């Protein structure tokens, strides 16, 4: 399981699995139902990281689990209706994403490239106006999972960097929280 997000309707969870999207119920007993896959012919690709936006859409990234040098990953949008689509292909290691509190823009990491991208989200859920938000050096570590707080500050976990860093919306680092581990993958608050 790469991620687990509570459904807006309170009816269980959505999950990201090796095999694709799934609906999960914990009660009265564990039950898992497939909910679609954007990579049925690519057994080495798996869902990796995801976030839900204020409209109940889940933005999920995928990666080649066997060879991350291959740009077989993608960023997909799973709609509340259950339909999904790949919104960007050609990604190595999809991490993040982080969605602005007002839902108007999103950040996404391609960890293999040490690069964070920014997109504007249109009213109908399309990603447009892609720009490079920030490129990190090898010494800084690899940008992995991330989130935004209610003020729109960006928090990124750094694999190999042993820390979580806070950035303003323009990408200027505000602070660093060092942790007693090197492989930090994500955070939640």
Across the structure, where does each feature detected by a protein language model lie?
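A short beta-strand motif characteristic of beta-propeller blades
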Residues: 1, 33-40, 82-89, 129-136, ...
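Flexible "stalk/tail and boundary" regions
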Residues: 9-12, 25-27, 76-83, 133, ...
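A short loop-to-beta-strand structural motif that recurs across blades of beta-propeller domains
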Residues: 20-22, 73-76, 115-117, 163-165
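Hydrophobic alpha-helical segments and helix pairs
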Residues: 31-87
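Short loop/turn segments immediately following beta-strands, especially the blade-tip
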Residues: 24-28, 119-126
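Conserved beta-strand positions in repeat-built beta-propeller and related beta-rich domains
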Residues: 7, 13-19, 58-69, 106-112, ...
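Loop/turn-rich, solvent-exposed surfaces of beta-rich toroidal or solenoidal domains
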Residues: 114-119, 126-130, 134-172
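Beta-rich, blade/repeat-based domains predominating
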Residues: 1-13, 41-58, 87-106, 136-154, ...
């Amino acid at each position: 399981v790469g991620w687990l997000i509570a459904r807006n309707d309170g009816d269980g969870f959505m999950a990201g699995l090796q095999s694709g999207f799934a609906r999960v119920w914990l009660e009265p007993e564990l039950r898992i139902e497939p909910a679609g896959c954007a990579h049925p012919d690519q057994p080495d690709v798996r869902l990796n990281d995801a976030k839900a936006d204020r409209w109940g859409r889940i933005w999920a990234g995928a990666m080649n689990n066997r060879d991350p040098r291959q740009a077989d990953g993608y960023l997909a949008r799973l709609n509340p209706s259950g339909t999904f689509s790949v919104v960007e292909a050609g990604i190595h290691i999809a991490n993040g994403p982080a969605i602005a509190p007002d839902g108007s823009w999103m950040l996404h990491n391609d960890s293999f490239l040490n690069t964070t991208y920014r997109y504007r989200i249109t009213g109908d859920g399309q990603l447009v106006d892609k720009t490079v938000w920030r490129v990190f050096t090898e010494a800084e570590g690899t940008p992995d999972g991330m989130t935004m707080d209610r003020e729109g500050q960006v928090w990124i976990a750094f694999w190999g960097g042993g820390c979580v860093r806070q950035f303003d919306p323009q990408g200027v680092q505000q602070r660093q929280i060092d942790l007693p581990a090197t492989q930090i993958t994500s955070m939640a608050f």
